[in-house]
A protein has these predicted regions:
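Alpha-helical transmembrane segments of multi-pass membrane proteins, especially transporters
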Residues: 107-108
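N-terminal leader/auxiliary helical segments
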Residues: 2-104, 115-307
């Protein structure tokens, strides 16, 4: 890729996040690599065949952990071919015809497991929590978590962008549907995202965001969400199809839709002076519990629509 084209693609990324807000990455690249790297330290807990596989192909696994986010414009595909679904994860695994591709496919499944927590719990709750501001949307809360990712993880992201994963890409290209962009264009944009992490300005922006906001994301808060995501990764890898996390939705569609409606209702009540912040805090605590319970029991999310 020429230097000019790379700069052009990097320049497109902020615009694309505005044009396709629904494609905002649930956990960002940094968090997914952090979670995947953690799982590679827990191999002794996995079934023997996965211990052997991931020990031999750790980089392919990590590439799989971020490859589900290659596609931009996901909502423009048929729901049966949405890349953030267990259906597609199974198809990727079925298409893996050698060990390196299988490691990538298991990384893809780990990505989906982590996103069940991000899209079904973390982001929906934060959207409701900041009901009295109009600016803090989906992408904002994903960026907030990225601000706490260690420098070593960003270095890993840049290293992966320079690896040759063409075999894995051919597998993914054969399974993942094109959107408004071809797989090749999506991949170039994605590589630009990984290289973007080298820019000090990007990391400085994330750090400044955390220091100046009135909406804290405390260490205890982060641990709650990320520990749950680690549990989802590990349990799905151990139990596979028997894992209760397979009932959770990686897109979080139902939870996000309900959260949007509740956020609007809370905002209207607050603006009309019919809801104090103390009353809202009490209600939000109950709603947070319902979201968490609904991860593995999606039908219980129906309670949110009548909250």
């Amino acid at each position: 890729m020429t230097k000019y084209r790379r700069k052009s693609l990097i320049g497109l990324l902020p615009l694309l996040s505005l044009v396709f807000p629904a494609d905002a990455w649930a956990w960002g690249v940094g968090v997914h690599l952090q979670l995947g790297s953690w799982l590679l330290t827990q191999l002794q807990l996995l079934p023997p065949h996965l211990q052997t596989l991931l020990s031999a192909y750790p980089h392919d696994y990590l590439y799989g952990c971020i490859s589900a986010d290659i596609t931009i414009g996901k909502k423009y595909t048929h729901y049966l071919r949405h890349c953030h679904s267990w259906r597609m994860g199974r198809q990727v695994l079925a298409a893996a015809d050698d060990d390196s591709r299988r490691a990538c496919a298991y990384g893809y499944l780990s990505h989906l497991a982590a996103d069940t927590v991000a899209h079904g719990y973390y982001v929906p709750y934060k959207l409701m929590r900041c009901y009295n501001t109009a600016l803090l949307q989906h992408a904002y809360w994903e960026m907030r978590v990225e601000a706490y990712v260690d420098q070593e993880v960003w270095d890993l992201a840049r290293a992966l962008a320079r690896f040759d994963f063409s075999d894995n890409d051919r597998m993914l290209r054969g399974v993942i549907a094109d959107t408004i962009f071809s797989f090749g264009t999506n991949k170039r944009l994605f590589n630009s995202l990984l290289l973007l992490n080298r820019l000090k300005r990007w990391q400085s922006t994330l750090a400044a965001l955390s220091k100046t906001t009135r909406w804290p994301l405390t260490e205890v808060d982060r641990r709650d969400y990320l520990d749950l995501a680690r549990d989802a990764l590990l349990n799905q890898m151990i139990e596979q199809e028997k894992s209760p996390w397979m009932a959770a939705d990686p897109t979080g569609e139902r939870a996000l839709t309900a959260a949007g409606k509740i956020r609007h209702n809370l905002q209207m009540l607050w603006l009309d002076g019919k809801l104090s912040e103390a009353e809202a805090d009490q209600l939000l605590l109950q709603l947070k519990g319902t979201l968490r319970d609904g991860l593995q029991h999606p039908d219980r999310l129906l309670q949110l629509t009548v909250a």
